[in-house]
Amino acid sequence: MHLKRSFAVIGGDLRQRFLLRQLRGLGFPAAAYRVPDTEDRAPDLSGCLQGANVLILPMPALSGSGVPLAEILNAAAPDALICGGMLGPAEDALRARGLSYFDYAKDEALLLQNAELTAEAALSLLLERLPGPLAGSRILICGFGRIGKLLARKLKALGADVTVSARKPRDLELAHILGYRRVTTGSFADALAQYDGIVNTVPAPVIGPEQLQCVRRDCALLELASLPGGFCAQAQALPGYCAARGLPGKYAPEAAAAIIRSAIFRELNLEEAR
């Protein structure tokens, strides 16, 4: 399809503001509703959606827009494409209405690019919280997915002594091949006392109250995973604990917006430059 694209950007954080600016900078008609720090925005939802055939919700889509999903569905044009991150249960409602949708949080390129931004921000947070210099510090990374792999590489390049915690044998073997120490998740025993920093990327319990007793009080604890996270609730009382979820939107919102825009453009078969 080669329809003229007209965008409506709804709610969200600074990523949505930068996304709106980028779309307008590329010459696309783009209206805004409840986008923060944006003066030129529609007074109501219906005004924002008038003539729009691409609706862009934030990530997460349902809790971040500030607008009930039912209102958006009722006001959207029948031929509109609804774009949002982590649509989840909204997909059923969209299908029931016969509306087209795109969950950009499932786009593999976006996930990799967001992981890179997350790893960069996590590195900065670690530098602020480690009890000593990064070079020579012993860092445990729980989980060896996209973020874990990228962060491990950055830390090792800067001289950290990196240990990777994983459950799958192939992940443990890959960690070994790449030059990291390795340990099976859950088999920490008293070894946690050796680490200067522990970074969790696993959205499931990893370090419980019993394991936490072995962690030094000056250890930097960085929680990157979505809820429920990997650290037990007691970890939050430790001075080195930091809940650092959603880092791309907080530390690099303009770059994160460009990543979202690129994912949507790929879905629409649009060129980056017009």
Regions from the PLM with identified roles:
Residues F7-F18, L23, A135-K156:
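Glycine-rich adenosine-cofactor-binding loop
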Residues M1-A93, R97, Y101, A263-R274:
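N-terminal ligand-binding/catalytic initiation module
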Residues L14, D37, P169-R170, S226-P228:
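Helix N-cap at the beta1-alpha1 junction of Rossmann-like dinucleotide-binding domains, i.e.
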Residues P60-I82, A175-Y251:
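Rossmann-like adenosine-cofactor binding region
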